[in-house]
Regions:
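Mature catalytic core of soluble alpha/beta enzymes
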Residues: 1-268
C-alpha cells in the first residue's frame, strides 16, 4: 500500500519484494500483458466476489486502464518507480508467493521430510517424496461441477512441485445470462474471454505457477501452451465445450475422471 501511495516517486523496497516483482514483471512481459500486476484499480472497480460487484460504465473502465500497464513500473535493484496513478495488485500471485515462502521455511526444518500444503484449493504445493515413493495426487475441480466433490481429474505431483488453478467458477456473478468472473483481461478491462473455463499449471516455483495460470487463462489454449514452454511448465486447459487440452508434460501426470469431458491434442 505504501508503494501505491507513493506512485510517481522513487521508493525503496525490500530485497524480497524486489525479487518477487522482478519475476512478476518478466511474466507480464513474456505474456505480452496477459498477466499484469498493475491492474489493481480495475480489480477494485469490478469488485467481483465483493460487496460492491458490478458491471462498470465503459468510461470508468477506460479511466482506470490509463493508469495500468506493467511498462509503467521500473525496478533498479531495490528502488521501484511507478508512474503516477499506477497501482500494484499481487493478488493473482499471492498464494504462489505464499507457497514459495513455505518452501523456504520447510527447507530449514530438518525433521520435516515430506509435506502437502493446500492454500485454499487453487494453489497446492508438495514437498519431498511420500514415504512409499508414490506420487502425490491432487484433484482438479470440474469448472462446471454441480457438486463440490465432482472433480475433473487428478494430477500427479512428484517431489517438490507447485500446482495452481485459475477458473471462471471461483468468483463470479451472472447478469442477463452472462458470467462475469474475476480474471480480468488487462487489454480490454473486462473478464477474459479466451474460450477456457479453467487452467491448471504445474511448475517448480509457486509464484510462476500462480501467475502463469492467470496468464494462460487470458491467453487461451494455443498461446498459453506456448508461454508454458518457455518456463518449462506443464499445463491443462478446459474449454467451454468440455474439451481438456494437455501439454506434453501434463499428459504423463493427468488422469481424467469426469465422463462429460474428452481429452484433445493442442494444435501447435
Amino acid at each position: 500500500y505504501k508503494v501505491n501511495a507513493d506512485s510517481g516517486k522513487d521508493k525503496e523496497i525490500s530485497d524480497e519484494l524486489s525479487g518477487y516483482l522482478e519475476r512478476l514483471l518478466k511474466i507480464a512481459k513474456d505474456s505480452e500483458g496477459a498477466f499484469d500486476p498493475t491492474i489493481g484499480k480495475l480489480i477494485r472497480l469490478w469488485d467481483i466476489g465483493g460487496e460492491n460487484q458490478k458491471i462498470p460504465e465503459e468510461a470508468e473502465i477506460k479511466n482506470v486502464l490509463k493508469d495500468s500497464g506493467y511498462q509503467k513500473v521500473s525496478l533498479d535493484g531495490t528502488t521501484i518507480h511507478m508512474d503516477e496513478g499506477c497501482s500494484l495488485d499481487l493478488g493473482a500471485a499471492g498464494k504462489g508467493i505464499g507457497c514459495d515462502s513455505i518452501l523456504e521455511y520447510l527447507e530449514t526444518q530438518k525433521d520435516v521430510s515430506a509435506a502437502l500444503m493446500n492454500l485454499g484449493g487453487s494453489s497446492v504445493m508438495t514437498y519431498g517424496s511420500k514415504p512409499d515413493g508414490s506420487s502425490w495426487n491432487v484433484a482438479v475441480t470440474d469448472p462446471r461441477a454441480e457438486n463440490d466433490d465432482d472433480y475433473l481429474g487428478v494430477v500427479a505431483l512428484n517431489g517438490t512441485e507447485f500446482l495452481s488453478t485459475s477458473g471462471d467458477y471461483e468468483k463470479y456473478f451472472i447478469e442477463d445470462g452472462v458470467r462475469y468472473h474475476h480474471i480480468m483481461d488487462p487489454s480490454t478491462g473486462y473478464p477474459a474471454k479466451s474460450g477456457v473455463t479453467g487452467v491448471t499449471v504445474v511448475c517448480d516455483t509457486g509464484l510462476e505457477a500462480d501467475a502463469l495460470s492467470t496468464a494462460c487463462f487470458v491467453l487461451g489454449v494455443e498461446k498459453g501452451a506456448e508461454l508454458l514452454k518457455t518456463y518449462g511448465a506443464d499445463g491443462l486447459f478446459v474449454d467451454e465445450d468440455h474439451h481438456v487440452y494437455l501439454t506434453e508434460g501434463m499428459k504423463e501426470r493427468f488422469s481424467l475422471l469426469a465422463d462429460s469431458y474428452s481429452v484433445e491434442d493442442i494444435i501447435e
